[in-house]
Every structure is written in structure tokens, then in C-alpha cells.
């Protein structure tokens, strides 16, 4: 039976940590673990998911929850409450629902203080890991028979009815993910005419019906070239010389968004090497299965710009195709011939590899995310198949593996700090006695303090295109090392609030100098327009987005400002200013004023704000209203607050909640959800209205939303898993299963505190 292990590093000599692996999550299969009842519970969860897989596509992330609740002998002892038709929500009903949620949330906390959770959803994360291990010969070493069973389960369970796979689990089928998952099935031993529900024949038919893999997007062309299923001449150039450009060039790496930089860094190394994996009998078979014409007869030069319409979200502008053509026709032939291949190309490859090693070391071989992880790992193997760097990469593969009732997934990377910050704030908002929530707050406080990044990247980090990180929080854990502004804001808020509480109950408060370091990071990430970027200062020329080489993402070339990062940072710095009024007072006041102005300036005409990391306008509006309220803006003195409230009230559904389709994100236009409300989005909207003091004008919409949340609570105190609610880069969704547990609790807590309720 599968078992989640927390904060363990084992005795692997290739594994090291900055904080004794606090926050690390790894799964192992233990044949001795689990009673017959526990095994039956897991199998029933799998069957229920499979039966309903086309109705609710995100999993409930139940395996670790079953494990934790079983190990803690959790029993929900408080009876469920329902508010009947025509009845008012009473203080007692809200309190009972809240306490039941808190009981469950505290039981789900790990011993190191964080709340484990899946963070997956995209269907192009896992296949490249399988490809890499297949090439290096470690597929059977890393993935045993139990892993393989779960990988196949995940692929089968998320195959669309038309035979393809979407960019993410709720998306329409795409060439990119259908081809990648088909190849993955074949590498795991599934025959071309095999697979559950004829998975392989159906997928192959979809691929061939849509033009064959010659129409795969550029990232797919790269992976197929690496595998020997494409010729490198069928891909647009990715010259490693990019890494030795002079600083005045518009495309200088330091001006790029960090994820764009980190993906194309190992890609350019592999491209520059023209690396191709071993041409095995399986690769030769796949050459016959995936194309509509003989492999040897394909005119590779003509397929470079092909992309299936199902994959095309960002069509390349003409100027970009002209740039690729120039590089392809003139630059590459020059750089790959003597003497330039020795004078320039070899130097560029070495500089690129130096950057890869630097990033690997500074993230403890986790890297910035899963797409980059696999590419960097493969680059290290290509450089030295028996080298220490590749072995260190292998040791961190388990950090990315997640298992739920719908099988094995590759995480984007962990969301430990992100989820923990919100869970702690939800518990604090509950206003329950410290006897009840004190132990959970103490553990959460410990995790947050342990997870703060204590140092900047090593050495001359600016020459390696890195920004300060000392004092920040990452999205996952301290070992990851990458600062994020909103994660830093949420961590700072938690530490500030907990510092006002008895240390014997919630733990010792954080040293003020470490709080000052956090403030320094936030101040450094504000742009001239007042907005906050996420990872590094924004400021590169906007026209560089015309060179976005991906077809299925938008706004990936340069760093941008984000509503959520801005709103969260205002809240954190307003709180900090109250508690430390003498520290950088003028800078912080200017920061808050500029940030509030940015929120006012970026409001949509309908009163909403676009959410970059959650679905979508509901999410962005929650953060914006929270930031504006913290900055002193009110419904009476701020038109943006009034318009934001109007947007939320107009979009409230008949059942009292809110529901927004993920399609809002790529369309950049509010698209209501068909059917019932989404409870996570309802919680966001409810809290947004409370920030704007809606209860002082007309509390009815708040009562309606709270009633829906209360009546939707499950027997164990949780809330049902519904539609996917996370997003990145406009077009790809992320599944955050802890959201359904945290946000309804938090919203009910704020509702009970701020909205006058009748006593029964």
C-alpha cells in the first residue's frame, strides 16, 4: 500500500538539505502497510473517481488524507448542521460548521507543520520524466512495478472520450499531450493495440486524424528530436549562444522571465549538442506509428512552423517566424561549422552548462519546476552519464512524485508553504480558543519559520541572472530556494500575527531582522507602475513578448506585475507598518500608495480584476479588494471598491454562490460556470465582499453564500472536490486540492466574525 513520508532524506549520499528536509514529501510502496479495510477504502476511492471521471476531473487527493486520518484516529464528533429553506443562518450554525472544518484541518497537518497536497493537472509534466529515464537507462530503477501501475492508472483515467489528452485534465485534447502520453504508454510496455479501453489505438487515431505528430508544438518537437522521433532540423533553433550575448542586447538572459530562462537553458544545451537518445526497436516502431508518411521521406524543414489548431493559443507573429528562419538558414549553418563551432559554439555550450550547474546547486537539485527539472537532469547525464550531478538529480526525483486515487502524477513542484500560509491564516481567522488550535498554530509557525530562505543565491548571483532571495519564502520549501513575492507576503503575515500571541503556545516569534529581510524582498519587487512581480523585478521591454516561442502559453518571455502579488504584499506591509512603524517608514508608505494605485489602474471595466494564478476574475477580485481595504480604501471613498463589489454581486448565482469556468483564463473574459456554484470560488467572493464591508449595506448576499457553504459541508467536515481552480500562464490549469478544505473554512470564519448573526 502507498504511504506518504514527511521530512525524510534517508541515507542517500547524493541528497542534501538546508533545513533537515522540513517540508519534503515522498511516497513509497510498503507491502506490509495497511489493513484490509484501509486497502478496500483506497480501492473504492479509485473506482468512484473512475466512474465519475468525466463529471469531476480533479481528484480528491484522498490517499494521504485516508492515511493521516487513520494514523491519528480521527473521528468527526460534532454533528453536521443544515440550514433549511427559508431559514436564516444562525451564529450557532456558522460556529458548528467552522469547528467541524477546523477539526478536520488540524488532523490533516503533517508533523513538520505543513499540509501535504497534490499540485498537478497539466498532462505534459510526467511523460518527459519517463522519456528521460528511458534514455538514461534508469526507468526500471526509479519506477518499480507499483509506480508503473499508478502511472498507467493516471494516463488511462484522464484520457478524453475522443481518445486524446488535454493540456490539462479539464482541457480539450491536444496534439502535444496526446503524443506525449501515447509515447509514455508505449515506453511502459503497453502495445500499440493495447491499453485500458483501447487507449493506444484510440490515441493513435486521434494523432493521425489531426495531421500526425508533425503538427506537435515546439516543446513537443524538442522532446521528439531528443528521442529520435523527429529530426532536429524539424525544430526552430535554440542556440546556446543566447547565454553569451552582451548585456545590452534586448534578449539578454537576465531580462527574461525566470521560467522561460530556465526551460530554454537546458533545451539550448541539448539543441546545441544535437543530442539524440538511443534508437531502440521501440523508437523505430514509434516512427511508424506516429506519422502519416514514411519517417525517411518527411521534409523536416517544412514542418518547423506546423502546429495543430487544438494546441494553438498564441500564434507566432510574423516577426518571430522571420527571426527563426534567419537563425535556421544563416546563423546555425555558420555556428555548426569550423572554425565557429570551436570558437563560439563550444564556449556557449560550456557557459550554458555552468548556468545549469549553478541553478541545480542553488535548488539542491530540485530546480525551479518540473519541466526544467527533467531537462536539466538530462543535460547533466549528457555531459557525464556517470557524474555526481546526474546522481544528485536522481535523488530528488521522488520530491516530484505524487499519488492519489487517480494514479501517479508529477507535481509542478510542491505547494507546501503556499498552502500552509493560507491554512494558518484560516485557523487564526476562526477565533477559536488556543486550547483547540494552539498545537496546529505552533506546528504551522515552526514550518513557516523553517521554510524562510536564509541566504541569497551563492557567489556572484547577479552575474548568474539571479535576484536577492534572503528573507523570502518559496512556493514549496526552503530547499527549493526561489523567492516569490506573494508567498513571501503570506509568510510574513503569518509571522507577524503569530508574534502577538503567547510564545509558549504558538512558539517563539521570528527575529525582527528576518522580518526586515522579508520586507526588503517585497520592496525590491515593486515596479514603477506600483505593481508587484512574482520572482524577479519586472522592467524588460513589453515587445519581447512577440518572441514567445511557445504556442500554448501567453506572457512567458518577460516578468510581469500581478494583481495577487500586489494585493497580498499591501496587506503584509500594512500589518508590518503597524507593528514596526520605524522601519523604512517612508518607503513602505510610498509602496502602499503606489500599489493601491496599480490595483485601481488595472481594474477591468466590469469591476473585476484578472487573476493570474487562480480561476480567475473571482480570484483576482478577492486579492484586489483585500489589498485596497488594507490600504485604507472603502466603498465610500474608492470607486474601484464600489465597482469590485458590483461585479461580485452581479455574478452571484441563484444558489447563493459563485462559479467561474476556467475558460475565463485563456479568454480573459468572465465566463460563468454552468451548473452549481464552486465552493472555493464562493469562499473567495464572500471574503472579498466582507473586505468591502458589504454587511454594512446589505448582508443578504453574504448570508446566501454562507448558507451554501454550510449546507455543502460533508460528514467528515470537508467540502466536496469540484472543478479545477488554479492556473498559470493564462492557458494551463493547476489542481490545488487543499483549496476546498481551507477556503470555505476561512470564509465562514470571516463571516462569523464580521457579519451580525442571530443567536438561535
Swiss-Prot record:
Entry's PANTHER family?
BETA-AMYRIN SYNTHASE-RELATED, TERPENE CYCLASE/MUTASE FAMILY MEMBER
Q: Which InterPro entries match?
A: SQ_cyclase_C (IPR032696), SQ_cyclase_N (IPR032697), Squalene_cyclase (IPR018333), Terpenoid_cyclase/PrenylTrfase (IPR008930)
The molecule here is called Beta-amyrin synthase 1
Q: What does this protein do?
A: Component of the oleanane-type triterpene saponins (e.g. saponarioside A and saponarioside B) biosynthetic pathway, leading to the production of natural products with detergent properties used as traditional sources of soap. Oxidosqualene cyclase mediating the conversion of oxidosqualene to beta-amyrin, generating five rings and eight asymmetric centers in a single transformation.
Species for this entry: Saponaria officinalis (Common soapwort)
Q: Which UniProt keywords apply?
A: Isomerase, Repeat
Please name the SUPFAM superfamilies in this protein's record: Terpenoid cyclases/Protein prenyltransferases
The entry's note on the tissues where this protein occurs is: Highly expressed in flowers and flower buds, to a lower extent in young leaves, and present in old leaves, stems and roots.
A GO cellular component annotation here is: lipid droplet
Pathway assignment: Secondary metabolite biosynthesis; terpenoid biosynthesis
EC code: 5.4.99.39
Q: Which residues form the active site?
A: 486 (proton donor)
